[in-house]
Amino acid sequence: MKTLYFIEVTDTFGGEANYSWVTRHVIKAKSLKGAVNALSRRSGISWRSDGFRYLSKSGATCAFIEEFDPEFHSDFRFDTDDRL
């Protein structure tokens, strides 16, 4: 069974998430790794785990991935939405 994942991708400044721009996505995948792979295919960016977030190879962007919670995440506008 596939799970929905909420993903935020943003820029970094000084190694920290900056949020001067952000894209939000809902991706359906079988696992967290599957969600990262789907994000990589769609964004064209390779990601590596840095504990609780994922960093791009350049370190200029980061992604936060968690399970989608309709009560909390439904108010956002999504750039990618696999719920349909």
Give the ranges of each region predicted by the language model.
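N-terminal cationic leader/targeting segments used for protein routing and processing
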Residues: 3, 29-31, 58
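A short, exposed loop/beta-hairpin motif centered on an aromatic-Gly-Thr core
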Residues: 18-33
